[in-house]
Amino acid sequence: MTLDAPVSGGTGGAEAATLTFMVGGSRQAFTVGEPILLAMGKRAVHCGTDGAGQAAKICNNMMLGISMIGACEAFVLAERLGLSHQALYDVASTSSGQCWALTTNCPVPGPVPTSPANRNYRPGFAAGLMLKDLKLAQEAALSNRAATPLGAEAAQIYGLFEAAGHRGEDFSAVINFLRGKDSTPA
């Protein structure tokens, strides 16, 4: 019996044993493996047959990459409009702009103390790993004839960010690329 079981939750989730496992494999294999997975995380979701865990992972991370770029673009625009980071966070985190990329991994220092932005973008989830997952999602979309124009754009943006030398930074550091800066602020 085998399972594919990629995770969501990053290094913080691994350290705190709060990972979510996206599991592919037979129901029988999942039933056997679930207690082992739950010893390392808080949730194991049976996504379907072999490969379904990986499919869920790339779909989830495509959504995450797109939403992080959206959050970053909103903060860059807010800066140009004279709106403080905290003001935008206070509005968006309690209204229709709310998303994990904002409330957990906020791309600007200040509003979320545990965000990588407060650690000079030391990664919880490195930009290079985001790009890898976005490329996998684009390969899957192409081979399955699924239209993912925003996923393709996100992959292109993260590809340019990586080419500029930022592979090892947290994926939220893409805000500096969108600001037109080639490196993170000091």
Residues covered by each model-derived region:
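Rossmann-fold dinucleotide-binding core
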Residues: 1-61
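Helical "substrate-binding/catalytic lid" subdomain
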Residues: 32, 52-153, 157-181
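Hydrophobic alpha-helical segments
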Residues: 182-186
